[in-house]
Amino acid sequence: MQRRKFLKNAAAASAAFSIVPSHVLGKMHVPPSDTLYVAAFGVGGRGNGVIQGLNATGRVKFVSFCDVDDRRAKPTYDLFPNVKRYKDFRKVYDEQLKDIDAVMVATPDHTHATIALPFMREKKHAYVEKPLTHNIHEARLMTQVAKEKGIVTQMGNQGASSDDSRIAREWVESGVIGKIHTIDCWTNRPVWPQGVPTPTQKDRIPKELDWDLWLGPAAMRDYNDAYLPFKWRGFWDFGTGALGDMGCHIMETPFSVLDLGYPTEAEASCTTVWVDDFVEADYSHSCPPSSKIHLKFEHEEHGDIALNWYDGGLKPDLPDELKDGETIGDTGGGTIMYGDKGTLICDTYSRNARLLPSNMMDLYKSPAPKYPRIPGGMDGHIANFVDGCLNGAATSSNFDKAGRLTETVLMGNLAVQAYQYKELKPGKTARDWDPYDSPGRRKLLWDGENMKITNYDKANEWVTRDYREGWELK
C-alpha cells in the first residue's frame, strides 16, 4: 500500500492514533509508528545489501526504488515487488518528496552528491555509500548542508561501527604506543581494470539501461561495455579508483583514533604503462594499476604524522617487531600505526586490532570502555543510522567525520592525477616528454580550509569537476 493511501486510511480509521513521518516531529522525536520511510537510489549490487540491512531492522518502509539499470536492480525488485520503481531520481523528488524521511544512495561515485543533495536540502536524512562523494568540493558541500539542515547522516563505511575501532582509540589514548608518527595503510584493490586506454568503440546500449541517466553529471560519450558493471571504478570520470573504493574503510581506524583534520601535504607515485620503446602511455582518464601515496597531517597532540597508502599489489615494509611467520592485515588490506613506544595493527574494516610486539597483548591491561559500542558492531552500522533517524542516536560515520575522511581519500587521488598529468611543451610529442621534469610530480601543498593547492595551480581543476549542462549540483 502506498504511504499516502495508508495515511489517509489510518486517519479515517482512528482519530486517536496516527502515523506521522519522523521528519515532521524532528530527529529527536520518535514518530508513533516508529517507522522510517526511505527512498533508495542505486538498488543493485551494494545497494541491494544496504536495502536488506535496512529491511532487517524491521523499522523501515521503502517508499520507492530508483535505478537506471533494470538488470542490476532485478534482484531487489524481485524481493520487494510492491515498491514503486523509478529510473530518474528527479521524478522521485517531484512526486514523493513529502512521503520520504530519508534517502539511501548507493549509485556510482560520480552521482552520490547529485542525487543526495536535493533531498538533504529538504531535511531528509541521508545514508550514502563510500566514498561520500566523487570530488573534494562535493564532500565539503555535503558536510555543510548536513550541518545546516540538522539531519542524521551516515556514510557506508561499516568499520566505523566496529568495537575494534573504539578499542584501538582507547588503547592509543591510554598511551600504550606513545605518540604516533607514521601510519601505513594498504589494500589488495583494484580487482577491476585500471591503467587502461579510454574506450573508443561504440557498443550497443542494453535495453534495460538508461545511459544518459547513468552518465548524470559526466560528459556525454558513447556507451561501451568496458564501463559496466563495476568497472567504472577504474575511470576518473565515474570512479575514484582503489583508494576511493577502500580508503574510507581502511583509513577509518586512524581517523577515529586521532580525529584527523585536513592533510597539509600530498605526494604520489604510480605504476608506469609503456606503449612503445621509451614512450609512456597517456592513460590519464584511467586510475593507475597501482600507486603509493604520502599524506602529512599536523596533530596537536602527536605532532606531524605521515600517512602512507599502498594499492595494486604494493604493501608497506613489515614492522620490525613482527616475528617470523606472523602476518599483518588480511586478504583485503590493513593498517599499521607506529608510535614511539609501540605499534598497533588491524585488518580491513578496523577488525582484529592488536599490539606489537605480540607479547604486549599479554602484558597490557585494556582500559575500561570509554566510547559507547554500537549494538551489533560492524553489522549494526545500518541499524545505527535508522536508530539515529528515529531516536536521535549518534551515528558512527556522520558527514562531519565522513566528509573529512572522504576529502583525505580524494586528496590522495588528486596527487595521483597530478602525477599522471602530462604537460607537454609547445611543439613536443609524447616521445619528447620527460617524466622527471613533470610539474605535477611533486609534493602538493594543501590549504584545507580554502580547498586549494598552493604550489601547482593545475591540480585545483580536480578539486571539483565540470558538470554536464543540466546536471549542476542543486
Identify the role of each PLM range.
Residues 84-88:
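Short acidic-hydrophobic, aromatic-tinged amphipathic segments that line or gate anion-handling sites
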Residues 164-210, 214:
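Rossmann-like NAD(P)H-binding beta-loop-alpha module
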Residues 103-104:
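N-terminal Rossmann-like NAD(P) cofactor-binding module of classical short-chain dehydrogenase/reductase
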Residues 1-14:
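N-terminal secretory signal peptides and thylakoid transit peptides that target proteins
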Residues 13-80, 159-162, 172, 254:
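N-terminal Rossmann-like dinucleotide-binding module
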Residues 108, 113-161, 175, 441:
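Beta-strand-loop-alpha-helix segment that lines the small-molecule cofactor/substrate pocket
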Residues 91-98:
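Short amphipathic alpha-helix with an adjacent loop that forms part of the alpha/beta core around
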Residues 202, 207-394, 398, 404-424, ...:
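Glycine-rich, aromatic-lined ligand/substrate-binding cores of catalytic
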